[in-house]
Amino acid sequence: MSSTAPEDVARPLLALPAIEAFDAIVRGRRSVRSYADVQVPRRTVRDVLELAARAPSNSNVQPWHTYVLTGRHKRALTDSVLRYYDTIGRTVREFDYQPGPDGWEEPYKERRESFGEGLYGRALGLSLADVDDREFYHRRNYDFFAAPVGLIVTVARNPRLSALIDAGAYIQTILLSARSRGLSTCAQASFLDFHPAVRECLAIPTHRTIVCGISLGYEDAQHPIASNATTREPVDRHVTFLWDDDD
């Protein structure tokens, strides 16, 4: 096997500035939970979602359907979910998308707890005893953290596993497309916990499964919660390399 490649093969597909720009977009994407009171142009939202539809999809079935909410429509969803939250008082999940608080195994349990401590403890200065304040910030999930735009992403119910894989690629493309335009986002599984309220408010048909909500807007970098930051494991912790000896 030749150790050299033709120039047209070895040359990067993207010019270096484009590579640097893409890397900056990926590294700059964060789950933002504080938003400025600044509207996002409709054209920008449409552009983000139009680009997201270029995400890979098994057999090109494109199983996603997204609801875009602003103004009174977003407020109506927030009111509906919080009313359900206050009345039912417990989560009602459509499917078991993740374990309960005590069902996580290591190392995921430790990572999850570290995230919670960073968010509530270091960023907001709250202890486990600050029940009311922690509850206040948890409820902000259902107002999309005051973002001007809220998205609810759904996929076809069948075949659900395939559709959920497609949804992951679609959602990530939304997040990166938004970031490239100076917008911030937060993908939120919390809306799944009260899916009956979401489904009823938006008249989501039964053949669709709710995947997540997404907050979309411009970050309020002055809010204390904006200081929260997460880390990632080094590549050798999550990748097994099986290099060929000739590579």
Swiss-Prot record:
Annotated GO MF terms: oxidoreductase activity
Upregulation: In the absence of 4-nitrobenzoate, expression is repressed by the transcriptional regulator PnbX. Transcription is induced by 4-nitrobenzoate.
Record field: pH dependence: Optimum pH is 7.5.
Enzyme class of the recorded protein, top EC level: oxidoreductase
Annotated catalysed reactions: 4-nitrobenzoate + 2 NADPH + 2 H(+) = 4-hydroxylaminobenzoate + 2 NADP(+) + H2O
Keywords in alphabetical order: Flavoprotein, FMN, NADP, Oxidoreductase
SUPFAM superfamilies: FMN-dependent nitroreductase-like (SSF55469)
InterPro entries, alphabetized: Nitroreductase, Nitroreductase-like
Temperature notes for this entry: Optimum temperature is 35 degrees Celsius.
EC number in record: 1.7.1.-
UniProt xrefs under Pfam families: Nitroreductase
Keyword Chloroplast: no
Cofactor note: Binds 1 FMN per subunit.
Superkingdom classification of source: Bacteria
Keyword check for Kinase: no
Cofactor(s) annotated in UniProt: FMN
Annotated binding of NADP(+), by residue: S59, R112, Y120, L126
Residues noted as binding FMN in the record, renumbered to the chain: R29, R30, S31, V32, R33, R232
Record's function text: Nitroreductase involved in the degradation of nitroaromatic compounds. Catalyzes the conversion of 4-nitrobenzoate to 4-hydroxylaminobenzoate.
The family this protein is said to belong to: Belongs to the nitroreductase family.
Annotated protein name in UniProt: 4-nitrobenzoate reductase
Protein's organism: Nocardioides sp. (strain LMS-CY)
